[in-house]
């Protein structure tokens, strides 16, 4: 099986209600608030080290039994800039995509430097389901 690094669309960032724990020396997000500044329409989005997916895409990931992820609630808001520029856009429901898999083993994994690694099966699913504005998708060498 082949694996890929993917850098999803960044449509915003952490909102003020995001809770981050740095007590272990690493950044661990306890509660995620994603605030949109713009949106090109992808159903997988990033704000390092977190990812969110549309509910529709999360259902497809579950239907395919892809490994290395679980889903949780995320608070979604729109910035003033978003509301001014995108008056006619309704955002779908998003969920927090918590990646807990091993890179190069599971369908979704995170490297030590916080890069998202996906299997070819996951890549095919993402490409068929509204992920077309990723900053980059590159082959991961073993």
Per-region residue spans from a language model:
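Acidic (Asp/Glu-rich) sequence patches and key acidic residues
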Residues: 1-142
């Amino acid at each position: 099986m082949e694996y890929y690094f993917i850098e999803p669309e960044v449509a915003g960032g952490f909102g003020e209600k995001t809770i981050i724990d740095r007590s272990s020396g690493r950044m661990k997000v306890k509660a995620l608030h994603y605030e949109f500044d713009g949106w090109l329409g992808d159903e997988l989005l990033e704000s390092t080290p977190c990812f969110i997916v549309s509910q529709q895409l999360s259902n497809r990931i579950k239907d395919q039994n892809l490994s290395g992820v679980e889903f949780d609630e995320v608070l979604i808001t729109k910035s003033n800039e978003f509301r001014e520029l995108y008056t006619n856009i309704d955002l779908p429901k998003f969920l927090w995509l918590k990646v807990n898999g091993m890179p190069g083993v599971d369908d979704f994994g995170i490297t030590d430097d916080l890069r998202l690694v996906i299997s070819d099966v996951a890549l095919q699913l993402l490409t068929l389901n509204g992920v077309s504005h990723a900053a980059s998708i590159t082959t991961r060498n073993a």
